[in-house]
UniProtKB/Swiss-Prot annotation:
GO CC annotation, single: cytosol
UniProt similarity note: Belongs to the class-II aminoacyl-tRNA synthetase family.
Name used for this protein in its record: Glycine--tRNA ligase
Main subcellular localisation: cytoplasm
Keyword ATP-binding among record annotations: yes
Top-level taxon of origin: Bacteria
SUPFAM superfamilies, alphabetized: Class II aaRS and biotin synthetases
Compartment annotation: Cytoplasm
Annotated coiled-coil segments of the chain: none
């Protein structure tokens, strides 16, 4: 970096000059309020259709909701984007971008440049693309995107967009911590020019904008866009769409558009942009696409090594797919896909090999196969065909069926005598009938030929969460493929994919060693890349990171264990370096969870905490992809400060907002459209509590009243709007700040956690969590939003397991069937003019929960037979009773095997007898009992009922008593003949057996493994 960094306007001039030299038209920013440079017609309209176009311009962008009254160091409602659009995308897209950074004085060897996954989309204009956020020492400075659709139209020709955050870059170059301190030119700062206006516009956008006027403007602009389109004027119509979009942004900032309405407004603007896009493409087509003559196409370049090699010995195989930076989450997916597909290809073609390994990093996926045989031998075999009589007529002519068969085999046969001319056909006699057999001789295929055909197909079959196209070849992959290495031993396999022919040339680390490198053989691959500063083994990179985290921890301060972040960091770097930075201690006063979210979600940093207290410390650990120096560390520290400042701003803003204001806002936030708002949900939870208190006295608590009242308040807070994963957690802080009961605050903080066994929750937190999940289950099942085998968008499976976990951990003795029946009364009986079936819905929910109960009991180490024995249709709907019954059965099996055998034997004997006998409808049981019947009835009458106390011990005692009863039953069965000729006596004895059988109804004893 030079001693005298560029002023903002000098930097802009330098970047524009760079792109002018690349052939870009230098536009001016558009003369309307746009939310981003993408809205400018030079991007939105020019990206449509097949015509090439290259442009660069500075776009003043208006985002009213991002205003911070001129006090935030780098968040503004009116800022600038330097936009570059390249259509079609050049092959050296990323290299051109990095060269533009060098032009403004950034020596990339001194910095940590990262390409972070960004699936960009703008729903308002129906635009989306795949690309990256570019981070400079932890600070996002640019967005790079390969557009895939604009105006909801898939693109004919892919455009590449570069959006420089020029204020942030200027802050970095000038070593400023606030945008307002940046030198605009040699005499004036950014703040002197814009800060007063920024404050004024924030006040207008948030506090004073005339919403009635802006609602009218929106309608007028939308109508004018439609009217203009009817006259075929797509360009003027688009201006009115831009105006409508800005009106919406003002209304959104004023908070006058609810969540439901917001979706509707966005959909309306998106519909308009689709109409504009269609109209614009039709208009350009009517002009015969005047710029199309400037386009060119790319074809694969033949090389001297484009001939398939002759391989005669066992050799190793290497396939490297070199691409622009893959998303960190895509690399492990690619590794799994490449390994699975490669094994499938090798197996399907009977290719012999000794071992297979797949390596992956951001810029490459590599397949290494050991000792691949040079040849595949397909052994000779015969295949039985049809009977000759079905193929030929008695005269020897081919029958219609024969014509069809021979055509399918590619054989020209018109008469029986023609068979002798074909060595691949033979006649065999099977069981006295003649059949035609197809003879397949031994075939030897070169492995190289198979790989030439299969490897390109393998790459195209790889599946990722999202794939893209980047040129006119139509090839799809997670990110643009820029090179292929395919070596069989020391020989090149010149496979072709799109415009690329494989070679032995790979590339080193983008910053540390960006040169082209030659791979001599698969055995040398890993070490050759290491010499070019690429650690291609993911296991080795992970080990480096884990060692670095330990090295930067101590007895007093250590990294907070975050396995997912370690995984992500492993696939964000090709040569990881671990270092440490710090931030101002003042931020440690913020909620710990907010600090962690800012560091992890936004910056990919590892937070640290004090080992003894668990309190967050002001040190963080960063994994770089370049050797850390003072510039890189200071840059990361400066990048974190604005993030924490923004978190602090949002948190303080929330603390200044009364909880009653949040509650009022819930009225405008839709829960489900058919079930009203989140406010309505809270009111329903209050009604649920009143019912629940009749099932458990614990629910009759003022602390629970307060927790329910405010449990959803933080959903409309500024912090949760930025970090949705902090909902509930922030609510706890806000309730404590409002001096509400600690028990209520803690419950709010607990109720949205993912709950697992062993996790401790407060009593109030347990009750609130349970009510919330039961309400969600009822709501979704009433609306028909039941999970499918592959789709569970509302996480109902998890919530059902959590219901069972909560009930089990707290031992709440509740009958879910009765409770759900009562809670269901708090929902409207008619949904969307249809009456929903209450009993059917509750049955479906119970069936769903019982399905999860099997999983839950399995996690508690109950055996399959024990689970099947207690989960019967007639079983109680009280999960605690079921779990206690299963535990008692488990104890019976382990400690009283003889008694268990008596029970099961007796049960099975009873069941067999009763299945063959029925009560006579013409005879009544006699009233005077014989001695044996009388004694047996006394035994049955004296037998204890089902346990009133819910505990495993009580159920075990019942089972032990049942074993004793079983002996009495056996004695009775051994001494009387049940099927007595006298119908009255037979009925009496059957009735006694039915009574006895009822004592066994707690379990399905046939399922128990004895």
């Amino acid at each position: 970096m030079s001693e005298h960094p560029l002023t903002l306007q000098s930097m802009i001039a330098t970047i524009l000059r760079f792109w002018s030299e690349q052939g870009c038209v230098i536009h001016q920013g558009y003369d309307l309020e746009v939310g981003a440079g993408t809205f400018n017609p030079a991007t939105f309209l020019r990206a449509l259709g097949p015509e090439p176009y290259k442009a660069a311009y500075v776009e003043p962008s208006r985002r009213p909701q991002d205003g911070r009254y001129g006090v935030h160091p780098n968040r503004l409602q009116n800022y600038h984007q330097l936009q570059v659009i390249l259509k079609p995308v050049p092959e050296n897209f990323l290299s051109l971008y990095t060269e533009s950074l060098r032009a403004i004085g950034l020596d990339l060897r001194d910095h940590d440049i990262r390409f972070i996954h960004d699936d960009w989309e703008n729903p308002t204009i129906g635009a989306w693309g795949l690309g990256w956020e570019v981070w400079l020492n932890g600070m996002e400075i640019t967005q790079l995107t390969y557009f895939q659709a604009i105006g909801s139209k898939p693109l004919d020709t892919i455009s590449g967009e570069i959006t420089y955050g020029i204020e942030r870059i200027a802050m970095y170059l000038q070593k400023k911590t606030s945008i307002y301190d940046v030198l605009w030119n040699d005499t004036l700062t950014y703040g002197q020019i814009t800060q007063a206006s920024e404050k004024a516009w924030s006040e207008y956008n948030f506090d004073y904008a005339n919403t009635e006027m802006w609602f009218k403007h929106f309608e007028d602009f939308a109508e004018e866009a439609l009217r203009t389109l009817k006259n075929g004027l797509s360009v003027p119509a688009y201006d009115f769409v831009i105006k409508a979009s800005h009106a919406f942004n003002i209304l959104d900032a004023r908070g006058t558009i609810s969540v439901t309405e917001r979706t509707r407004y966005i959909a309306r603007i998106r519909q308009l942009t689709r109409l504009v896009a269609d109209s614009y493409v039709e208009w350009r087509a009517s002009l015969n696409y005047p710029l199309l003559s400037l386009s060119s196409t790319s074809e694969p370049k033949e090389t001297s090594e484009s001939v398939v090699p002759m391989i005669s010995s066992t050799e190793d195989l290497l396939l490297e797919i070199g691409s622009e930076e893959l998303p960190a989450t895509f690399v492990p997916i690619g590794i799994q896909q490449l390994e699975s597909l490669a094994r499938q290809v090798l197996t399907d073609h009977n290719i012999v090999y000794e071992g297979l390994e797949v390596l992956g990093s951001p810029r490459r996926l590599a397949l290494l196969v050991k000792n691949v045989a040079p040849e595949v031998v397909q052994k000779a075999f015969e295949k039985k065909g049809p009977m000759l009589t079905s193929l030929f007529s008695p005269d020897g002519d081919v029958s219609p069926q024969g014509q069809q068969f021979f055509a399918s085999q590619g054989v020209d046969i018109s008469h029986y005598q023609d068979l002798s001319r074909h060595a691949s056909l033979a006649i065999r006699t099977v069981n006295g009938s003649e059949y035609l057999f197809l003879l397949h001789p031994e075939i030897r295929l070169r492995t190289a030929d198979i790989l030439m055909q299969e490897l390109p197909l393998l790459i195209q079959r790889m599946k990722f969460p999202k794939k893209m196209v980047w040129d006119n070849s139509g090839v799809e992959y997670a990110r643009p493929i820029r090179w292929l290495v395919a070596l069989y031993g020391e020989h090149i396999l010149p496979i072709t994919l799109g415009t690329i022919i494989a070679s032995r040339n790979s590339f080193g680390h983008r910053q540390l060693d960006p040169r082209k490198i030659s791979i001599s053989s698969p055995q040398d691959y890993v070490e050759t890349l290491r010499q070019a500063c690429v650690v291609v083994s993911q296991k080795e990179r992970r080990m480096i990171i884990e060692q670095g985290l330990r090295a930067h921890s101590s007895d007093t301060i250590s990294a907070i264990p975050l396995p997912r972040l370690i995984e992500e960091a492993t696939f964000l770097s090709e040569h990881p370096f671990v270092s440490c930075g710090q931030f101002s201690e003042q931020f440690c006063a913020l909620p710990k969870e907010l600090l962690i979210a800012e560091m992890v979600n936004h910056q990919k940093y590892f937070p640290t905490h004090e080992t003894s207290s668990g309190a967050i410390s002001n040190f963080f650990i960063v994994v770089c992809d370049n050797s850390p120096n003072d510039t890189i560390i200071e840059g990361n520290e400066k990048a974190l400060t604005p993030r924490l400042t923004d978190g602090e701003f949002l948190f303080k803003q929330d603390l200044q907002t009364p909880l009653t204001t949040f509650i009022e806002k819930l009225k405008s936030v839709t829960y489900f459209e058919a079930l009203g708002s989140l406010y309505d949900k809270v009111e329903r939870l209050k009604a649920h509590q009143r019912v629940f208190s009749t099932f458990s006295s614990l629910a009759a608590s003022e602390d629970l009243d307060i927790a329910i009242q405010y449990c959803k308040a933080d959903l409309v807070s500024a912090v949760v709007n930025e970090f949705p994963e902090l909902q509930g957690i922030m609510g706890e802080y806000y309730l404590k700040h409002a001096n509400l009961p600690t028990a209520s605050a803690v419950a709010v903080g607990e109720h949205l956690r993912h709950i697992t066994m062993g996790q401790k929750l407060s009593t109030i937190g347990t009750l609130l969590s349970l009510l919330d999940r039961l309400d969600n289950l009822l709501a979704c099942f009433i609306l028909g939003l039941k999970p499918t085998s592959s789709h569970d968008p509302y996480a109902l499976r998890r919530q059902s397991l959590e219901v069972l976990t909560l009930v089990s951990a707290s031992r709440l003795p509740i009958d879910l069937a009765s409770l759900l029946d009562r809670l269901a009364d708090h929902f409207p009986s008619t949904i969307e003019e249809k009456v929903w079936d209450k009993s059917k819905t509750i049955h479906e929910i119970l069936e769903f929960i019982w399905g999860r109960l099997k999983t839950f009991m399995g996690s508690l180490e109950f055996r399959k037979d024990e689970i099947a024995a207690v989960l019967i249709d007639s079983a109680t709907k009280n999960p605690i009773e079921i779990l206690d019954t299963a535990e008692a059965l488990q104890l019976l099996k382990e400690e009283h095997t003889e008694k268990l055998a008596v029970i099961t034997t007796t049960h099975n004997r009873l069941k067999k007898i009763l299945s063959s006998l029925k009560l006579s409808m013409t005879s009544s049981p006699i009233e005077v009992l014989g001695d044996r019947e009388s004694n047996f009835k006394q035994v049955l009458d004296a037998f204890p009922g089902f346990p009133k106390e819910t505990s495993a011990h009580a159920f075990l005692e019942y089972f032990l008593s049942l074993a004793d009863l079983s002996n009495d039953i056996q004695d009775f069965l051994n001494t009387v003949h049940i099927a007595n000729d006298d119908g009255a006596i037979r009925n009496l004895r059957i009735s006694l057996l039915l009574t006895a059988m009822d004592k066994f109804s707690l379990c399905h004893w046939e399922s128990v493994a004895v």
